[in-house]
Amino acid sequence: MAKRIIYNEQARRALERGIDILAESVAVTLGPKGRNVVLEKKFGAPQIINDGVTIAKEIELEDHIENTGVALIRQAASKTNDAAGDGTTTATVLAHAMVKAGLRNVAAGANAITLKKGIDKATEFLVGKIEENSKPISDSTAIAQCGTIAAGNDEEVGEMIANAMDKVGKEGVISLEEGKSMTTELEVTEGMRFDKGYISPYFATDTERMEAVLDEPYILLTDKKIALVQDLVPVLEQIAKTGKPLVIIAEDIEKEALATLVVNRLRGVLNVAAVKAPGFGDRRKAMLEDMAVLTNGQLITEDAGLKLENATLEMLGTGRRITINKETTTIVAEGNEKAVTARCDQIKKQMDETDSSYDKEKLQERLAKLAGGVAVIKVGAATETEMKDKKLRLEDAINATKAAVEEGIVPGGGTTLAHLAPILKEWADKALSGEELIGANIVEASLTSPLMRIAENAGSNGAVIAENVKSKPFNDGFNAATGDYVDMSAAGIVDPAKVTRSGLQNAASIAGMVLTTECIVADLPEKKDAAPAGAPGMGGDFDY
């Protein structure tokens, strides 16, 4: 296919146009008074949404070159979402501000490579400062505050996540389900999560989120490699009759057996998903036994004289719901408390008897996974559109609170970055010179952009607010919900340090890449053939 090649300033300007379109669409959602965006869907009702990364994923432009700019800035949002689970809009706004300021300097003759070095050095300095100013999370009030801000100022959501963390622990599993009523409820049930995802992406039932969600599945647990599909046929036939889904957790599944499962899944013969068992050697077997206890099934192992080809439905475990993504598997089980408690007591006994600190640590991990359970938040709403929006906000809030537990919290609402701007300027003036200093100044100028956008979305003058905040103590910022200047930590307006850090790093990375772009190679738009002329008497003269 013929290609279109664009050089220098023209290439960078084309990218900039795409970046402008995406940044503007996403930035309207920032802050407590951010607006919603409506996404038109080919099928079903339109989606009303307030989530930066979801909006970014939907935007595709007709112009291939501009679309490349969209894809670049979308990457900043996606990477921030992968690392911290929130802060995608902030990352987009920051990247946009850095690109705009940087392109002005490149157009004026600055060397893009030296600018990028300055941007990287400034980012490294800021990451250290964010770490310095972060405070560890100490109580459930701070957790609730974090969740509230991430969910778009929904206090009920913040409280619910804090309660969930109290019940399952800070490392515990919090899962989301679509509820059957209008209210959002919290329930704690038996369950566990382990760090292995699906073997093949073809098992995903939700292709947008790349997740496999199976309700009330049978669970086949085995510690052997499944090489031949013939071993599975008897049990697959029994399950096909019940019409229920199946999850296979095995040491491994070889190509032939895997291909057969995938084909059956794609043809709709059997709703199945396969996962590799976690751990190695004896630990793997012990974890599979834990899962068997949890799901009220049996581990099919030759040590116990059980063979895969002789497996029956009675040997399989059952669960309420299993959610599998590319990295983790979450099992939500229920109604098996006695057996789980007995198994936990057995693990505690083993911990008392062992002298090895390594074994103790691994047993402790197993105990935490088994005893912690799963907090299930059932999302309730009046309409499906509201349900989807609520679910995305809850997901952001859960991710934000987990990030806060990991790396602590900093003053929110764009305050931290705005206060770091003069600190960065002071350091850069001493430590850098020439075009590297200009690169650091580009970062410094962009640091107030999230705060300015939050203020503008609330109907205030962003530039004035940003200057006022910079002159105040580090903890003081602008509360866009009330229009006052307050102590952000005391007012409960906090952001996880990890979210602020990830957003800044990803924005700087994308800005550096755009500034150092000198040439774009893209597909030429295809010429569409003219439509054939209509037959006589078949004119296009319609009244609508």
Swiss-Prot record:
| Enzyme class, UniProt record, top EC level | isomerase
Q: Where in or outside the cell?
A: Cytoplasm
Q: What is this protein called?
A: Chaperonin GroEL 2
Q: Does the keyword Isomerase apply?
A: yes
Question: By its UniProt entry, which NCBIfam families does this protein fall under?
Answer: GroEL, PRK00013.1, PRK12849.1, PRK12850.1, PRK12851.1
The species is Prochlorococcus marinus subsp. pastoris (strain CCMP1986 / NIES-2087 / MED4)
Family, per the entry?
A: Belongs to the chaperonin (HSP60) family.
Gene this protein is translated from:
groEL2
Subunit structure comment from the entry: Forms a cylinder of 14 subunits composed of two heptameric rings stacked back-to-back. Interacts with the co-chaperonin GroES.
List the GO cellular component terms.
cytoplasm
Q: What is its EC number?
A: 5.6.1.7
Keyword list (alphabetical) reads: ATP-binding, Chaperone, Cytoplasm, Isomerase, Nucleotide-binding
